[in-house]
Design a protein with these regions (language model features):
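Positively charged n-region of N-terminal signal peptides that target proteins for export
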Residues: 1-4, 19
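Sec-dependent N-terminal signal peptides
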Residues: 4-13, 467
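Acidic, polar-rich low-complexity tracts and alpha-helical solenoid repeat scaffolds
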Residues: 18-605
């Protein structure tokens, strides 16, 4: 009995091994055939695919590849006979008509090809189950109109089928944005769950230019749908569109409409406000935060909105800023819920009011009440900034180092590392600054990574070689003085590079690597002092020396803004906005330049 059981076990085991070996052989053959096919070795691929198809005649992948191999080797008759034989054995496999049609298409027999395509489409009325396969084949053969017809036929005969997504993608391939957007919108209309998917695909066509053809068509499609079939989702999409176009006030209007219908959630408005603030659209941002303050019952949400209102007051130099902060502390107190407001207030005291000691006291009090290590880190970051402002570098570096130790790999630790690099740069310790910046170039936070790369390149491009002065030490010191709001001293430091012969034998002249950076910093300081014409002179000198500088689009935008907002020279403003539009189409200033140029030209909004 034991021997019989052992024999059965060995037999079954042998069969299993043989089966696994056979499957492995098939997989290896399929991989080899596919490799030959992709490399264009169609004769070799044909032999293997034929063997695979003969052993698995129901495998449509093998069939498709075999037919394609026959076509690529001009064996059209063999392909035709194979397909007709397959159809003869099963007339329900209507996708075979597409193969047959394309077989004639490859032979330039257009009319014959169309006959088979029509048969395939008509056959779907009786066999809609093959609709997806037929449409997919049409798409693969770039027969996009036929693919759309196939999907629509299936949907007409099967009310549960929904191929609007596939249809929309095909319209996109055809460049028919109107139909594409209509199909995507229909998909959302049928089921809101498609929202994120559709938004992701639509974003491939939407730009930040409100005059972009796709943007206009998408907006019109949404407005038509909103009128014929009102749904909250259309407002959400319009809000998203306006946000992409930096039309934040219009986005707010859509969110207000949603809020009026369903009061409660203000997170979208808070997000729009923050984006507008970061993008320097302060009026629109203020509208968002004012609305939250007026409508929200959530204390934390209200405090957050007030924080940004205070930040806007600081950046726009509102004379009532001090009063605004004091009122906030009267209403909400100085506690853990207002820590960010306390940090913002300390920043205001230091960099706007030149009261760093008072700011230091505010932050020391905040630090004593903070319980979260993240809150403590934020406070220490600002304390470090204030200590640098006061020239107490070593104490500042201690705070920054503490954050790095306590919050390893966190965004705040990366920010602290950048502060270490920046402080080291200010001190003239360029090697240590570069060591920190090398680590940060791969930062997960894009803004920190960008700042790190910019500072690293500034040091690398301008640092002294073989102890020969390069002016970098003087530039770093001028930047420190500017950070400390000692603008006149900073300008004096920079002017010495042009006048004195200590660093450059002939003074700083075009051709020196540091020339652009020095003039650019001078221009920014002169703008701050409202010496706009002098700033224009400095910026123009950079362009004269090198109009291909990486600063060129920054310079053009700065000049356009000065002419537009401060010197009231609309003609010159248009000239420089236009330079960005036509000479720097990938510039971060493109959207604003285009909008402002159109406004100055008198275009209707």
């Amino acid at each position: 009995m034991t021997k019989i059981i052992l024999l059965i076990f060995l037999t079954v085991n042998s069969l299993g091994i043989a089966q696994n070996t056979a499957q492995q052989t098939v997989q290896n053959d399929a991989r080899l055939a596919e490799t030959y096919y992709r490399e264009g070795a169609y004769e070799k691929a044909t032999q293997i695919f034929k063997k695979l198809y003969d052993s698995s005649p129901f495998n449509t992948t093998y069939l498709g590849r075999l037919v394609s191999c026959y076509q690529e080797t001009n064996q059209f008759l063999i392909a035709e006979n194979l397909l007709k034989s397959k159809l003869k054995s099963n007339k329900n496999e209507v996708y075979l008509y597409v193969y047959l049609g394309y077989n004639h298409e490859k032979q330039q027999q257009k009319e014959k090809a169309q006959e088979y395509y029509k048969i395939a489409l008509i056959s779907l009325e009786k066999n809609p189950t093959y609709g997806r396969v037929v449409a997919r084949l049409f798409t693969d053969y770039n027969l996009l109109d036929e693919a759309i017809l196939a999907y629509k036929k299936v949907m007409a005969f099967n009310e549960h089928a929904n191929y609007n997504f596939q249809i929309a993608q095909i319209y996109g391939e055809k460049g028919n944005f109107k139909k594409m957007f209509e199909s995507y919108i229909d998909l959302i209309a049928s089921n809101d769950q498609y929202f994120n998917l559709v938004q992701r695909y639509i974003s491939q066509y939407i730009t930040d230019d409100s005059e972009n053809k796709a943007n206009i068509l998408f907006k019109k499609t949404l407005l038509r749908k909103s009128a014929s079939n009102p749904k909250d989702v259309w407002n959400t999409l319009l809000s998203w569109l306006f946000t992409q176009q930096k039309e934040y006030s219009k986005a707010l209007l859509q969110e207000k409409a949603l809020f009026q219908r369903k009061p409660g959630n203000l997170s979208a408005i808070l997000t729009i406000g923050k984006i507008a603030f970061e993008d320097n659209y302060f009026a629109a941002a203020q509208q968002c935060f004012n609305f939250i303050v007026a409508q929200s019952n959530n204390k934390s949400e209200v405090i957050n909105a007030h924080l940004y209102i205070a930040k806007i007051a600081v950046v726009t130099k509102n004379p009532e800023t001090e009063t605004l902060f004091q009122n906030l502390f009267k209403i909400f107190g100085k506690n853990t819920s207002t820590l960010k407001i306390q940090v913002a207030y300390a920043d205001f005291l230091t960099f706007s009011q030149n009261k760093p000691r008072q700011a230091n006291i505010v932050l020391e009090e905040a630090l004593s009440s903070a319980s979260s290590k993240f809150d403590k880190a934020r406070i220490k970051l600002k304390l470090g900034d204030i200590l640098v402002y006061r020239g107490k570098f070593n104490k500042a570096l201690i705070y920054f180092s503490q954050i790095q130790t306590q919050l390893k790999n966190h965004e705040l630790a990366q920010e602290a590392r950048f502060k270490v690099a920046q402080t080291s740069y200010f001190k003239g310790d360029f090697d240590w600054a570069k060591a920190q910046l090398k680590v940060l170039k791969g930062s997960t936070t894009q803004l920190i990574a960008n700042d790190a790369v910019a500072l690293f390149l500034k040091i690398s491009d301008n640092e002294p070689v073989d102890s020969i002065p390069s002016g970098l030490k003087q530039l770093a010191n001028a930047e420190l003085l500017a950070f400390q709001n000692k603008d006149e001293a900073a300008l004096t430091e920079l002017n010495r590079l042009f006048i004195e012969k200590k660093v450059f034998i002939n003074g700083l002249i075009p051709g020196e690597v540091i020339y652009d950076d020095v003039l650019f910093l001078q221009a920014k300081l002169l703008i701050k002092q409202k010496k706009y014409k002098e700033a224009i002179v400095r910026l123009s000198k950079i362009i004269e020396a090198d109009n291909q500088s990486f600063l060129t689009d920054d310079i053009y935008f700065m000049m356009a803004e000065i002419y537009d907002n401060d010197l009231n020279n609309t003609e010159k403003a248009q000239e420089y906005y236009q330079k960005i539009i036509f000479e720097h189409p990938s510039s971060i200033y493109l959207v604003d330049a285009r909008k402002k140029y159109r406004k100055l030209r008198g275009d209707k909004a």
